[in-house]
Amino acid sequence: MDTKEGSPHVWPTSVEHQSNTAQVHFVPDGGSVAQIVYSDDQDRAQQQVVYTADASSFTSVDASEHTLVYIHPVDGSQTLFTDQPQVAYVQQDATTQQVTVLLPAAQSMNAANLAVLSGVSESAQTMSLDPVSQINRASLTVHDHRLPPMEGADSSTTINSLPSPNAHSDGKEDDDDDDDDDDDEEEEDDDGEDSDLDDWEAEPPRPFDPNDLWCEECNNAHPSVCPKHGALHPIPNRPVLTRARASLPLVLYIDRFLGGVYSKRRIPKRTQFGPLEGPLVKKTELKDSYIHLKVALNSPVDSEGAFQEDLWFELSEESLCNWMMFVRPAQNHLEQNLVAYQYGQHIYFTTIKNIEPKQELKVWYAASYAEFVNEKIHDITQEERKVLREQEKNWPCYECNRRFMSSEQLQQHLNSHDEKLDFISRTKPRGRTRTRRKFGPGRRPGRPPKFLRFDISSENREKIDLGTQDLLQFHNKGPHFEDCGHSTLNGLEQSELTLGTSTQGTPNQQQATQLLPPNEISTPVATTSILTAEDMRRAKRIRNAALQHLFIRKSFRPFKCLQCGKAFREKEKLDQHLRFHGRDGNYPLTCDICNKGFISTSSLENHMKFHLDQKTYSCIFCPESFDRLDLLKDHVVVHIIDGCFSCPTCKKRFTDFIQVKKHVRSFHSEKIYQCTECDKAFCRPDKLRLHMLRHSDRKDFLCSTCGKQFKRKDKLREHMQRMHNPEREAKKADRTGRAKAFKPRLASTDYESFMFKCRVCMMGFRRRGMLVNHLSKRHPEMKIDEVPELTLPIIKPNRDYYCQYCEKVYKSASKRKAHILKNHPGAELPPSIRKLRPAGPGEPDPMLSTHTQLTGTIATPPVCCPHCSKQYSSKTKMVQHIRKKHPEFSLLPISVQAPVLGTAPAVLTADGTSGETVVTTDLLTQAMTELSQTLTTEYRTPQGDFQRIQYIPVSQTTGGMQQPQHIQLQVVQVAQAQSPNQSQHSTVDMGQLHESQGYMQHAIQVQHIQVAEPTSGTQSTPQVGGQALSPSSQEAEEVNPSQLQTPASQAQANSAVQHAYLPSGWNSFRGYPSEIQMMALPQGQYVIAEAAVGTPVTPVSSGQVKAVTQTHYVISEGQGVLDMKKSSSLAEEATPNPDHMEQPASNSSQTTQYIITTTTNMNGSSEVHISKP
């Protein structure tokens, strides 16, 4: 096909489009890589483009800018491109550049077509490429895809070809000139809106320089931040305390601003600290700002005989010393509370006085050690001695302003003041007189008053009233005594010091006195001492002194700082605090904001951090704010209305500002603390911490009454008040004797639709546990054995729990959790299935995150609690229930008893011609049918397991005469038959009874059960009132299988047979009635072969004959007529054992066959037909 040169473009190429040029070169390396090379002025790196296996597209390798090259075959129906070899156009956005190459219908894509693609622009244009010389002409398969529509292309436009690629190499210089023109136009159109990344150019590799920052993406180093990839994301190291600060004892702390070591609590006298740690240097290397401590060496001469210089502790480096380097030296004896001395090779500090909390530790040399280091100890001046003496006397007397060293000394001194107030004469009237007296309030009859009443003169009455009013007015910092009538002042009752306690008495006392006879009225005898106003004032001073002594240490702070509002109890503390504000100007550095003084630059810098984020105290009632809390407290008084504060939002009233502030903060503040686990938010961080306990698994608070655990202490307190309230317990005890009248809430039709039913109340339940709870609450006298539904097995799902970090699989979530904690520490645990929330619309299934898979269901017998009616699927859960609900029985051995029905099985009869019908219960049929369908392989009977077969021959009478007969209950070991005449199948279980099976006979155990059976052939159908056929207490005999083939002299005929097939592992379900056992048979016919061996007839009584037979039944599915040859061949395979032969050889064996057919009626019940073939 010839190429038309000089054909115009399909789309006109504008100037602005010509600037964005690119060249696509094919790299002849196996025909798999193409390369797009941009012009130099575009400042773009080269991109390698790799096409896919079908050669239909190319994908860029570069991650920052993707380039996709699509190669499409042209539809053959479009004659537009028949004369053009190729058409290429570009579509470009911010991150993707798409180059589409169009091929004629008859042309295939090969390496020659990818040689050069030049002039590709944003607008589509045509390009003509002639085949290049045979360079990698390996043909690429191009699928016949339909050509995608191209914007701007008109179907009527004629596409002419461009110059051939052969001429491209010859005219390369012309192309370079065109590229230069395009670059010039691009620079003119540039409006300066390009980002820095567009102007970024790759730098040449730099040599190693420790000051350069390495960028792995650029594979180069930069002087600072990488201009293309930006700054790194640093994670700083965790700060570590120095050795000196980390070794500080817990009872001490270092002041951040002043330095020095202070006590957190009271440290008693004679407490030792140490030893001191630090480097040893010469004296000339010591610094003056620290105490100088010298170490006494064991020998002044070293091993070489040279004289050793004295060594001192250098205490200036925190990384080499311990906390004792921060203890500052004392300037005088008043400040000193530690002594330094050497003991052995170490230096210790010992307290010489009691150190109070927040008191600085200051040390000086001991007397002998000071002489060793050539220092003097601090002498005690008279002023210091006086101050020390006053400090030791912490018990002042406010009557005479004396101070004492102990409370005992103060009490003895107060007794001397009491002697001056000896104006009361005490009496001893106990048992001295027989006159009846009426005493004051608070004294019961028979007890004398503590003090006598006094007559107070009228001139002193007014003075006493004034003194009483002064007594009631105490300091505002002290407590308020409202009930002054019952107070005691230094042995004096207040009621006896007021006017109301005079001889006049109260109105009640006057009335009682008037009712007494005149000879029984006692009049108090006044002494010569009279309570004067001076005595009252003295008593007031004693009372005030005692009360002020009790509360002054905690509440009374008379010395207040005018700058910050902080108050102190002693003036010395205030003076020490004022020095922090720089009042004296002794500090070299002062804060410009608060004028607080500091001794070091680091202390001032730490202080300035508080001003950067200084707190402001805002009023909750108005927009005003304060920088100090005491100013806010003084301000909020203006918002008091009628003695109460009102909430500005809900208008709730409070008597205290603290209460209204807590109310506003809790209910009307912005909730900025968001819970990360749920959507709740809180206004305070402490409330969020309390809420986070809801999402944790820890329950640290245990109720001592019921054993319930809680995550929070307030929830435990609320539980105790609500559940264990004495009133509630009394009401609960009163309710136990009264039972509510039960009214059925369901109709009879709804009742029949439930799986679990209470037949007494005619009530249905959806789950087993609901029925168990109902029976234990409403019918505690009813036994579980009486409810057939509760004896059915429990069907629970079986899951596999996968470890998401390895290939381990576990059967329980707890074992998987233990595995992850042990082998994958720190890994996230999968969520619990019980705590999953249902997925919302559009959300993924939450079960996918649990890494579990349902593998089937497991039917397990229920495990009953021996102390209540609860049932569980495993013994472990039952034991947990006993420990929680029956702790008094938790230490006793637990015996698990599975429920067994005691109902006698129904007896099946046969008349010889027609089968007898047994109709099963609808509920039990449904339950056992579902059970048989959901059995897993774990509960299938293994080969060689023992099975259980029950049968009852029906007694038949002839002429009114009955003869008893011993029928055998045999436990037969069942295995697959190996006979070539029988088909081999797996062992049959309850879910596989519909399959054809063959059985072999093995060693059996024979147990004898006596029932009555007629001897005559008359066919009548009276049932034997028997009991459940279960292994009796008699000793079983071992019978060899060969005995079953021994000929017998008697044959049993016309007897109905009942059989049951249950795995021996289900011991708890033996003893089911026949309708439960028979209903598990699917629809079909089953043959029972009966082999009877006769025994000598033993006379039992008149008219009765006792015969012992050995009968064996083999269950097999078959036709209506049993093949006698197969039965005889089975009998010939066994060899008789003479040791076990109990019958003569002349007895002939006879086999009787029974056919069991199960059908289903229209009403859903099952019927069992037993007949002879």
From Swiss-Prot:
Residues 430-447 have a biased composition (Basic residues). Its main location: nucleus. The keyword Zinc applies. Residues 146-211, 430-451, 1014-1056, 1125-1173 are annotated as: Disordered. Transmembrane segments: none annotated. Residues 154-167, 1161-1173 have a biased composition (Polar residues). Residues 248-366 form the SET domain. One of its GO terms (cellular component) is chromatin. Residues 926-1153 are annotated as: C-terminal glutamine-rich region. Residues 172-202 have a biased composition (Acidic residues). GO terms for molecular function: DNA binding; DNA-binding transcription factor activity; methyltransferase activity; zinc ion binding. A zinc finger (C2H2-type) spans 395-417, 559-581, 589-611, 617-639, 645-668, 673-695, 701-724, 756-779, 801-824, 863-886. Residues 267-371 are annotated as: N-terminal PR domain. Residues 1150-1160 have a biased composition (Low complexity). SUPFAM superfamilies: beta-beta-alpha zinc fingers (SSF57667). It is found in: Nucleus. Disulfide bonds: none annotated. SMART domains: ZnF_C2H2 (SM00355). The SET domain is degenerated, suggesting that it has lost methyltransferase activity. Belongs to the class V-like SAM-binding methyltransferase superfamily. Transcriptional activator, essential for early embryonic development and survival of embryonic stem cells (ESCs). Supports cell growth and survival during early development by transcriptionally activating the expression of the translation initiation factor EIF3B, to sustain global translation. Activates the transcription of FLNC. This is PR domain zinc finger protein 10. The lineage of its organism: Eukaryota, Metazoa, Chordata, Craniata, Vertebrata. The gene is prdm10.
